[in-house]
Amino acid sequence: YSGWQTQPDTPTVQGTIERALTLVSRSPEPISIVGAGRTDAGVHARAMVAHVDLDLSPEEAEELRFRTDRYLPHDIALRSIVPVIEDAHARFSATARTYRYYLTTKKNPFAEEQMLRMHFDLDFERMNAAAAQLMAYSDFTSFSKLHTDVKTNNCRVTEAYWQSGAHDGEWVFTIT
């Protein structure tokens, strides 16, 4: 996929879900969804939140999720569709976002597309000291794209740390 957000003439996660929802629900109009954020091509989202404006009971929402999930390709899954308050917005109502970045110092062919492989030893004590410094800053303009509609690049980092992963040599960086 070329990331999350719908783009002309290229497969995206959002576009794939929208087509599936439209087809399965037999909607006369294309169904549009709004994601809480975006991912770039090659980035995996394990828990992307999105919203869609539909008037469904909880039972109808679960039936739509089940049927749509069966139609989606193997690499996209809908975990739930739940009714929320009318003015809820996946992007603008979010109060925090957590990102996790995975790396390994050992070869693992099963995780090759989900982890960055490092070919040298890392000092995680020093990396955690550096990560903690992120919480002292609020202006992240240096990490932002230029010439966008974003009004501010200020945010509050509440946690930033490295921890060992599920297997020897695997590490996870978490930032909220």
Give the role of each language-model region.
Residues 1-176:
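Structured-RNA-binding interfaces characteristic of tRNA pseudouridine synthases
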